[in-house]
Amino acid sequence: MRFGGMVGYLDVKRGNPLKKTKVLAVINQKGGVGKSTTVVNLSAALGEAKKKVLIVDLDPQGNTTSGYGIEKEELEYDIYDALLNDYPIEDLIMSTCEPNVFAVPATIQLAGAEVELVSLNNRETVLESVLLDIREYFDYVLIDCPPSLGLLTVNALVAADELLIPIQCEFYALEGVTKLLESMRMVKQRLNPDLDIFGVLLTMYDSRTTLSRQVAEEVQKYFGKKVFKQIIPRNVKLSEAPSHGLPVTQYAWLSKGSQAYTKLAREVIRRG
């Protein structure tokens, strides 16, 4: 099912620039924590709340791209071309099944970007420069970071206002978080002094297990008020939705997964 269609420069910039845009890097160096799931479903829920959202897929796996039904095999250009070939990002922006959500897609081509960025003088600030002219036309920009702390992730840290960190309620949940926070502090000192944590999101929570409850308590102790009150549960419909190229809010809007992301969107909006 293919929803993506090129939107174009004039459509993106239709209307007046918004007064304030929040750029959030959705990040965790561990894979399988619900990062792409969160980008897809939080963006959809924000869109349904009448917020204009741009998602930037910075993960070569392209799960956020396919999660919105965009056929990666049919794409001639992607975020790689904006980062390394000076391709205008406004010409990469695609429509999605949610009218208020737009996507800059990624394909496996992006896997080579880490090596190619090394040779650039401005290698850590390319994404920030690319987003500069269009960010103000959206309420939120959500960046799906790769599960690593390489140059693509550093670019996301520099471009972002704040970080949204998903942590799964499973064994070794906090493994690697210390390293992520060290990277954040380095970027904050050198390149992005205002960078901070917007929120920490508990995912894959199963209230039936002692482990989930213990991990939730541990994360709460570690991050305090940064932890969102809304927790994302383990949910079959949430797992099924990507194979249909739909956010769970459209695939199964009455499911627990859909309700959780809808409530999370409200909490995100309240935080400003």
Question: What is each model feature region?
Answer:
Residues 1-272:
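P-loop NTP-binding core
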